[in-house]
Design a protein with these regions (language model features):
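Sec-dependent bacterial lipoprotein signal peptides
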Residues: 1-22
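Residues that form or immediately flank small-molecule/cofactor binding pockets and catalytic motifs
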Residues: 10-13, 51, 79, 157
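N-terminal segment of the mature soluble domain
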Residues: 43, 47-116
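Generic marker of residues within folded, mature protein domains
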Residues: 5, 12, 36, 99, ...
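Alpha-helix termination/capping residues and helix-transition junctions
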Residues: 16-19, 38, 100-103
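C-terminal/domain-edge helix-coil "capping" segments
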Residues: 22-42, 137-198
Length: 198
């Protein structure tokens, strides 16, 4: 009986570990301009390129809040830049917003890939003791795989300072995914000493 319980717990912990290891956000690609000689940026215009205005506002505001929490000034572009139907923002429009807010950098994030999968996990029977058993019901869950590209530009020169592609595999809400991506990007920018408190 004890052996069966131990085996059952082992399977349970293995399952939990698998679920945890499959969640979260990773930067699968990053590129830093080695020729960039400017100082770390400290006042950033945030632009989320999407046709979904709710997601845009939410993402930009979360990014601003997270940057401010580490001492970096930031502003969302939602009030100064209208999103075109083709999602192609003109350079002049961005520069006008930069001039309005006096930013020294621009961060632009856009979706480059998304998959949603519904997975059904069949139930089973766990046996214990001599004749005892329990039946585990099946369940279904939805897993999202989201890939976002985030670029950091020098506001004065338009030079690309840093670029990263994040991959998030999660069953969490869109808001949780946004938070994961933002925190991962900021951590990498700090690691590369590209942002600093103003």
């Amino acid at each position: 009986m004890t052996d069966n319980i131990v085996k059952g717990l082992g399977c349970l912990f293995s399952f939990i570990f698998l679920m945890v290891s499959c969640a979260g956000t990773d930067l699968t690609e990053t590129q830093v301009d080695g020729a960039y000689k400017g100082k770390p940026v400290s006042d950033i215009l945030i632009i989320a390129v999407t046709g979904n205005e709710h997601n845009r506002r939410s993402y930009e505001r979360k990014f601003v809040a997270n940057l401010k929490s580490v001492g970096v000034e930031a502003v969302a572009s939602e009030k100064s830049i209208s999103m075109p139907g083709d999602l192609k923002i003109k350079k002049e429009t961005i520069l006008s917003a930069v001039d309005q807010y006096k930013n020294d950098a621009v961060i632009i994030t856009q979706l480059v890939g998304k998959e949603t999968k519904d997975v059904y996990q069949r139930g089973g029977v766990t046996r214990y003791g001599y004749f005892g058993y329990t039946r585990n019901p099946g369940y279904s869950n939805t897993t999202k795989k989201v890939r976002l590209e985030t670029n950091l530009y020098d506001a004065k020169t338009g030079e690309l300072i840093w670029s990263g592609i994040s991959k998030t595999l999660s069953k969490d809400s869109t808001d949780r995914i946004m938070n994961d991506v933002i925190k991962t990007v900021i951590a990498n920018l700090k690691k590369n000493k590209l942002i600093a408190p103003k």
